[in-house]
Design a protein with these regions (language model features):
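Negatively charged
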Residues: 1-149
Length: 149
């Protein structure tokens, strides 16, 4: 599993741990919990230190429709966040988003695109966007979003 991408690790662990009528409660990779499930709803937990990701993060399209919460931890070296939450139509919660260090990020395009259940975001006013050169479609399709700090 060492050479697997993050999404391949999640898919592998989900398939490996299927039990109790296909109801998975969590997925652990390297003893770190990355996915929690409640019936058909996912909570994704990103931790760069454990995943070893250095340039971009991606969520597989076959699980985005069920993600309701994403928790971000220790993601400091990522440079490309484009499309990270794109099409997460049930997503409404982002614990840790305000603490996300995006100092090295150059691309935020379509980050929250079509996240139609987001109503407000945590305070992102302290984000350092000085290196970002692409923010196109950042909030495109977020029709319920009424508050950005």
């Amino acid at each position: 599993m060492e050479n697997f991408t993050f999404q391949e690790k999640i898919k592998y662990q989900i398939q490996k741990n299927k039990k109790d009528n296909n109801k998975i409660t969590e997925v652990k990779i390297f003893n770190e919990k990355f996915v929690e499930m409640n019936e058909s709803n996912f909570k994704i937990i990103y931790n760069e230190r454990e995943m070893g990701l250095k340039s971009s993060l991606e969520i597989s399209n076959d699980i985005t429709s069920n993600i309701v919460e994403i928790e971000l931890k220790q993601i400091n070296q990522i440079t490309n966040l484009s499309n990270m939450f794109n099409e997460c139509k049930r997503l409404y919660s982002f614990p840790g988003l305000s603490k996300l260090n995006i100092d090295n990020v150059t691309n935020l395009s379509s980050l929250f695109r079509n996240c139609i259940n987001i109503r407000k975001l945590p305070d992102i006013s302290k984000w350092n966007t000085s290196n970002v050169n692409n923010m196109s479609y950042l909030f495109s399709g977020c029709n319920c979003l009424f508050s950005i700090k």
